[in-house]
UniProtKB/Swiss-Prot annotation:
Protein name: Large ribosomal subunit protein bL12
Disulfide bridge map: none
Chain's role: Forms part of the ribosomal stalk which helps the ribosome interact with GTP-bound translation factors. Is thus essential for accurate translation.
GO molecular function: mRNA binding; structural constituent of ribosome
Keywords: Ribonucleoprotein, Ribosomal protein
Subunit structure: Homodimer. Part of the ribosomal stalk of the 50S ribosomal subunit. Forms a multimeric L10(L12)X complex, where L10 forms an elongated spine to which 2 to 4 L12 dimers bind in a sequential fashion. Binds GTP-bound translation factors.
Gene Ontology CC: one annotated term: cytosolic large ribosomal subunit
BP term (GO), one: translation
Family: Belongs to the bacterial ribosomal protein bL12 family.
RNA-binding found in the keyword field: no
Annotated Pfam families: Ribosomal_L12, Ribosomal_L12_N
Keyword Iron: no
């Protein structure tokens, strides 16, 4: 039995047509019990996990003991009228602002927590 080198294999594959390469890949998948598609999907999933979140939602979890102060803080932050702000606060948990940057979300959270609200950033 003669030994085939990697270079000889590469030259042989380079001489194949696209259809022949597809058939070769299928035969290799069957022979070795692997799937080429599963290997290709791995790095893409890892790249998505690395992305940092840039837009946040500020959620009023509860208004705590001082509902009036929280309503005032919500009005100041959102520009809503008194009735709309009151309805929003009373419907907690509720999204106050969507798609804001991290600094704005942190600032809004701080001002609402100072008024007595429980706030989450998602």
């Amino acid at each position: 039995m003669s030994t085939i080198t990697k270079d000889q294999i590469l030259e042989g594959v380079a001489a194949l047509s696209v259809m022949e390469i597809v058939e070769l890949i299928s035969a290799m998948e069957e022979k070795f019990g692997v799937s080429a598609a599963a290997v290709a999907a791995g790095p893409a999933a890892a790249a998505e996990a690395v992305e940092e979140q840039t837009e946040f939602n500020v959620v009023l979890a509860s208004f705590g003991d001082n509902k009036v102060a929280v309503i005032k803080a919500v009005r100041g932050a959102t520009g809503l009228g008194l009735k709309e702000a009151k309805d929003l606060v009373e419907s907690a948990p509720a999204v106050l602002k969507e798609g804001v940057n991290k600094d704005e979300a942190e600032s809004l959270k701080k001002s609402l927590e100072e008024a007595g609200a429980a706030v989450e950033i998602k």
